[in-house]
Each structure stands twice: as structure tokens, then as C-alpha cells.
A protein has these predicted regions:
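Short SAM/SAH-binding signature in class I
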Residues: 184-192
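Flexible, active-site-proximal loop/turn residues at the rims of small-molecule/cofactor binding pockets
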Residues: 195
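A short glycine-rich, Lys/Arg-flanked "PGG" loop and its adjoining helix->strand segment in the class I
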Residues: 204-206
């Protein structure tokens, strides 16, 4: 980030000096666009499985220091720590142990017994699967096959393989799937189909 700041200052200074020279200014502007975002976007597009497009948008898998992240547009779909099995099994971001959903999942055995039936709308990277306990029955509802592929099949994220190797995944619109399920088939249902700060009221109400 410090290096980027220095480069930005240099480009800004050169830009000021070339304001009168149209060709030089355009060339400098193009270089700035490539340096700040464009190059990274192009390199991600060329990496195998780093970008995946589906009917629902573009998914981007990017690596940071000690973690891997899945983005859908501007929304973070999940972050997994890397470096050891224990780190890979650790729920992160808004699924962390102290979060609301984390506390609900940890309380499930006491509230519903060792055979609790857990449903999750929205698979993401599969983070919530690491709250699964022996004897529980978990079911994920996911509308996008691309998300299932990223979370389960590519090996980029290992929440499912580490914590719940053979999950039940219902592919399709969760509203339809839940309507088809028999009444009282779940003890705990987590809704994780939000898109950024846009709340899906059609899932929150009758």
C-alpha cells in the first residue's frame, strides 16, 4: 500500500506536468488505469478458476496474506483462513463464533438435541458447515450451481471437505424448495441469501 501511494504521487505529479500535452496526458491516464485496478483485474481473469461467471453474476476468488476470499460483485461471500487444518475449519467474518448465527448454531444441540435438523439458505463458501456436529442433519439451499462448484468441487475452499464432506444441497430457488418440504422438517433455519445490505424481504415475510 505504501508503494502504491508513492506511485500514485509520481503519476499525479507527471499528470500535472502533462496537462497541456494531450497525447502525453492520455497515455499517462491509461497507465494509471492499468496500474490501479486494471492490471489486477486482467491477471485475475487469466488465472484458472479465479473468475467464474454465471447467470447471477461474476464470482472472484482472490488470495490475501493467510486467507482466501470469495467475492460476488462488491459482496464478500466468504473468507477462509489458510495455513493449517485448524485455521481452515475456523468460521470467519459474519459467521464467526461470536456472531448471531454462530451462537445459534452452537446452541442447537442444547435446544434441539443431538439430531438437530439444520437448514441454510445460501451456501457461499460453506463456512457454516464447520458448526456441524455428529448426528446432526444439515441441508443447504443454493440457487446458483456456480457457487456449489466453487464451495465443493474446485478445492479452492475446504470448509465442506473438512467439516461436512457429504452435505445435502438442494439446488434451486429456496422459496420453492422450502414450500415443497414437509412442515416442521427443520429445527433451525439460517437465511444467508442477502446481497450486500439489500435485505430479501420476500424471504423474510409471508
Amino acid at each position: 500500500e505504501e508503494r502504491q501511494g508513492t506511485v500514485f504521487l509520481v503519476i499525479a505529479a507527471l499528470g500535472f506536468l502533462t496537462i497541456g500535452a494531450r497525447a502525453g496526458f492520455v497515455l499517462l491516464l491509461a497507465a494509471a488505469l492499468v496500474l490501479f485496478g486494471g492490471y489486477r483485474a486482467l491477471s485475475l481473469s487469466m488465472e484458472r478458476d479465479a473468475r467464474m461467471r454465471s447467470y447471477f453474476g461474476v464470482y472472484t476468488v482472490r488470495d490475501g496474506p493467510g486467507y482466501r476470499e470469495l467475492d460476488h460483485g462488491s459482496t464478500v461471500h466468504g473468507i477462509q483462513l489458510r495455513g493449517s487444518v485448524a485455521r481452515e475449519r475456523t468460521p470467519t467474518t459474519y459467521y464467526a463464533v461470536g456472531s448471531g448465527v454462530g451462537q445459534a448454531m452452537q446452541a442447537a444441540p442444547a435446544l434441539y438435541g443431538p439430531s438437530a435438523r439444520i437448514g441454510v439458505v445460501g451456501l457461499g463458501t460453506g463456512t457454516l458447515s464447520c458448526y456441524a456436529r455428529p448426528g446432526q442433519r444439515w441441508r443447504f439451499y443454493e440457487i446458483d450451481p456456480a457457487v456449489v462448484r466453487i464451495a465443493r468441487d474446485t478445492g479452492q475452499f475446504t470448509y465442506l471437505s473438512r467439516c461436512l464432506p457429504n452435505p445435502e444441497i438442494r439446488l434451486g430457488d429456496a422459496r420453492v424448495a422450502l414450500a415443497q418440504d414437509r412442515s416442521n422438517s427443520l429445527d433451525l433455519l439460517a437465511l444467508d441469501a442477502f446481497s450486500s445490505d439489500s435485505v430479501p424481504m420476500h424471504l423474510m415475510t409471508r
